[in-house]
Amino acid sequence: MVLMIVSGRSGSGKSVALRALEDMGFYCVDNLPVVLLPDLARTLADREISAAVSIDVRNMPESPEIFEQAMSNLPDAFSPQLLFLDADRNTLIRRYSDTRRLHPLSSKNLSLESAIDKESDLLEPLRSRADLIVDTSEMSVHELAEMLRTRLLGKRERELTMVFESFGFKHGIPIDADYVFDVRFLPNPHWDPKLRPMTGLDKPVAAFLDRHTEVHNFIYQTRSYLELWLPVLETNNRSYLTVAIGCTGGKHRSVYIAEQLADYFRSRGKNVQSRHRTLEKRKP
């Protein structure tokens, strides 16, 4: 059974995540004090029900040791996983402005910007321990729920999931990435008028990139690096490894290379997911 702990900065989508987990059959509790986690788990263990609990800045323990103690007291039947939701500062400010809700720390005479920064510092012990960090800056409510369903229901039990995502540097680096590779030095299909409207998923773009030795060398050396360290990462109690590939716009080179890497590790029997941030933004 799984005990999913959902945390993250206010406005990042914790309530949405908890509702999505409830739809997946999790027994959900909002803002349960950390010290009560073992009691909840023992109660649900006999019923063989997985649980999801949200923890925000209001019910954070005074020290990381209290959280670690609660985790160590969980029944053996439960496998704890920590999901941390985040978004960039400007997105959080915009969301609060749109909803006109008060930030949980605003009552301490802090401005919204200061409250967001203070909360980030207070939640850092949980963020650093997270099994999965999700950047919701560019996600709608429905996209976040669907992504969680895909990652949580699609993942094999106790196996590391490799996530390959493409992005454009002009849109910013994904904050959920464990590794970031820059491919802006590779030949750019953008300068071919026939290829410009296409993406790295289209065969003519793939054929263009496939003709260049440096593209093959980069893919080979990147996958070799990941293969070298993958056994260590798999034994390090991780659930996800997110590898971000970036080019200028996130449309051609990064998409192609992310797909090549995903296909390679998928062919090796790994649990693999891929996503393309720029292409997802362009969907109607």
Curated annotation (Swiss-Prot):
Homotrimer. GO terms for molecular function: ATP binding; GTP binding; RNA binding. Residues 266-284 are annotated as: RNA-binding. Keywords: ATP-binding, GTP-binding, Nucleotide-binding, RNA-binding. ATP binds at residues 8-15. It holds the Pfam family RapZ-like_N. It comes from the Bacteria. It comes from Escherichia coli O1:K1 / APEC. This is RNase adapter protein RapZ. The keyword Transmembrane does not apply. The keyword Disulfide bond does not apply. Belongs to the RapZ-like family. RapZ subfamily. Coiled coil: none annotated. Modulates the synthesis of GlmS, by affecting the processing and stability of the regulatory small RNA GlmZ. When glucosamine-6-phosphate (GlcN6P) concentrations are high in the cell, RapZ binds GlmZ and targets it to cleavage by RNase E. Consequently, GlmZ is inactivated and unable to activate GlmS synthesis. Under low GlcN6P concentrations, RapZ is sequestered and inactivated by an other regulatory small RNA, GlmY, preventing GlmZ degradation and leading to synthesis of GlmS. GTP binds at residues 56-59.
